[in-house]
Amino acid sequence: HTYRVAELCELITRDLKLDEYETDVAWLTGMLHDVGRFEQIKRYNTFNDAQSVDHANFGADLLFKEGLIDTYVDGFHDDKYGVIVENAIRNHSAFRIDERLDEYTVMFCNILRDADKVDIFRVNVDTPAEDIYNVTTEELKNSQVSPEVMAAFDERHAVLRSCKKTAVDHVAGHIALTFELVYPISLQIAKERGYLDKMMAFESDNEVTGKQFEEIRAKLNEYVASVRPL
């Protein structure tokens, strides 16, 4: 995941025609964005932020408060771009980016957030949902999408973790991340690699859920076609 996110950061920056140093900085945010995960599993034996710590802030603290960044890049701790990397990592999994950040820093945050989301789509396609969400096949195939989650497709935004109540809410919630992609190239990559179609092809044994996914497919396809023309 780390290497793929770094690669996607580079692809996005090149599409934005940023310079080589900016591209390297964006690549570095991808390489370091989940550094908190390693210490999280070591200390708490879980990747679940709700049961341990926010891995994004934890990783940023390890790198920039405890000095771990110095093992990766010399003299980067107090550098202008060091601050940008710290903020990008700190905000990469937040529901919304810190509003106090300047526009230039927000750009790097968005590059990393887009790259992370696109590879999360890949993980959802390549890995059994039962393993990702720690649910049984029966729960996944028989549960319904909660009203709050369905509302996100009407309102075109991501789903708060607290709104996900059922097993299938997690599937729909990850699909809804599409609404948060900032750069057209990010959506183009996700579409061309087949991630969106494969996620939306989820099949349920519950008739109500089947109809809900028909609605999800219609609304997401409409969004992709009209809001983010490829």
Model-derived features: positions:
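Divalent metal-dependent phosphate-bond-processing catalytic cores, especially two-metal-ion Mg2+/Mn2+ enzymes
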Residues: Y3, E7, L11-T23, L32, ...
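Catalytic-loop motifs flanking and including active-site residues across diverse enzymes
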Residues: H1, D24-W27, H55, G59, ...
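Short coil/turn segments at secondary-structure boundaries
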Residues: Y44-D54, V73-H77
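An active-site-proximal "capping" alpha-helix that borders the catalytic cofactor pocket
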Residues: R4-I12, V53-L68
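His-Asp-centered metal-binding catalytic motifs of divalent-metal-dependent phosphohydrolases/nucleases
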Residues: T23-N48, G59, L63, Y81, ...
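Short, solvent-exposed secondary-structure capping/transition elements
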Residues: I41, T71-V73, Q188
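Acidic/histidine metal-binding catalytic segments
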Residues: K17-L28, I69-R90, T105-I111
